[in-house]
Each structure stands twice: as C-alpha cells, then as structure tokens.
Amino acid sequence: MTAADRPLRAALLGVIAVALVLLGGGAAVALGIGRDEAPGADSVDVGFARDMSRHHLQAVEMANLVPERSTDPEIRQLAFDIAETQQNQVGRMQGWLSLWGVAPSGGATMAWMSGPAAGGHAGHDASAADGAPMPGMATDEELAALRGLSGTEFDVEFLRLMIRHHQGGAEMAQYGAEHAQEAAVRNLADSMAQTQAAETTTMTRMLTARGGTPLPAP
C-alpha cells in the first residue's frame, strides 16, 4: 500500500462501519435493494460499487484538502458539495456490498466493463490488477503537488484534477446505469452521470475564470 492509499483505506473503513450499522437495523429498504437474489461477485453491480467507491474516495480526499488551502468561497462550497455527495454515495455502495455478502474490494479493476466504453483505457480489461489506477484518478505525484499549493494556485490545480476525475468516472457511471441488474444501482449510476456532467461544466467555467486550462481528458 502506498502512502497515498492510506487516506483512502481509512475513509473506506469508516464508510463500511457506517454501512454495517445500517444493515444491523434492517436497512435493505433504505439502501433501495429489494431482490432476493444478490448480484454475483463478477457482476456489473458489484464491480461498479467496488470501483466507483474507490474512485469517489479519491475525490473526497481531494475535496478535504480545500478548507486549509483555499479562501475562495466558490471553491470551498464546491468542495463541500463534492465531499458530502460522494461520501454519501460510497456509504450506499458499501452497504450494498455488505448486504450482498461480497468483499468491499477485490477483482480486476474495471473488468466488469466490456465493449468500446471499456476498451479505450488501460486497466479496463480483465487482466488489470486489483487496485490498478482508474481513468481520471490523480497520481501520487499529482496529489503530493496539490498538497503543497495554496491560494489561487491550489484552486486552479484542484479544479484541473477534479474535472479530469469527473470525466474519468463518467464512463463507469454510464455503463453502470445501462448494465447493472439492480434498479437501485442503475438509478444511482444515472444520477452520478448527470450530476458529475453538470459539475464538470461548472468547474470548467470556474477554471476559465481563474485563468486555468483543463488537463487532457482521460
């Protein structure tokens, strides 16, 4: 495990703990799951929940850097919204995984995706290692550089990384919306796709206003 993975693991463990408390209270209905037959470990539903949880947790990690490094009210509000929304969604996805009786992580990264949407990026095929980088995710070096910035420089780089991060998650969300067997999973994935598309438009406007240019799309 790299140093950059530790905050993600800690956040994930916290989310799983909350999910288990919910499940102890009979939260299948609250989680939106009503099927008797749980999705299998190699299903789109499980793969989506696992990979999108990890993808989301990096966005939460980046958003949590904002309060100490930015004084821009618009950036701070954006980061708060991203952190709250995506942490909540991770809780739902981890709750599903617990309910289905599968591990919260595992399997080849993005092996649950197939076809053109999956083939365009390294790490989408079935041979990709568990924990391999997903499209749009920041590298350890990029995160380290972001932590060293403040003020407008931080704001610009935060927007650049978050725009690319959202773009990378869009294909996963769209694929989940179209191919998951559980209606609750399809609905959440569709909501993610729409919300992140709108946020990407907003962040691109904010970046331009601050004199920045987007990173190449993943």
In which residue ranges do the predicted regions lie?
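All-alpha RGS (Regulator of G-protein Signaling) helical domain and cognate RGS-like helical scaffolds
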Residues: T2-P218
